Amino acid sequence: MAEKEIGIIFDLEANGLYKDATEIHCISYYDTAAEEMFSFNDQCPGKGLSSPITTAVQYIQQADYIIGHNIIGYDLPLIRKLYPFFNPTGVIVDTLLLSRLYHSRLMSIDKERNWKHMPLQLYGRHSLEAYGYRLGEYKGAFSKDTDWKEWSQEMEDYCTQDVNVTRRLWKHFTPYLNGSR
């Protein structure tokens, strides 16, 4: 990624999986050019407390690079479903696919490393939760305690933490992509 190009590393939280979702509760993203994190929701429009989801969707659409974990399988299709105008032209980088490509033997790697704090059921998994343990950027337990029906500040904080984990994962894969590993 060139210096002037805008990369958006993002995640979203919605009220269900693709088939059932009718609302995106929040979007958080890290702008690689500005080196800044942003969060968006539709909970307090016009009160200066948040920017609307459509603003985030427009920023993502205009980015030169769109980076996230499972964004090809979930996030981008969901945005397209709920915001039909969404038509990104930037390069899409899915860290889930990079993980499967570059770490196809993840179970063996995890067994060799014998992670001190990672639960055994996460060994061999390409999930963001598993990578949070591997990279020392734990994503939190919010997802285990919610039904996803309503927005909450805890949900938005969880979304932002997912972006932090994805940033670390993107940094991990960058040497693979530029040929230095």
Where are the regions that the model predicts?
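Entry/capping segment at the start of metal-dependent catalytic domains
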Residues: 1-29
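A short, aliphatic-rich alpha-helical micro-motif
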Residues: 60-61
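Active-site-proximal helix-loop-helix substrate-binding element of RNase H-like nuclease domains
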Residues: 18, 29, 35-53, 64-179
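Short alpha-helical segments and helix-capping/turn motifs at coil-helix boundaries
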Residues: 10-13, 51-55
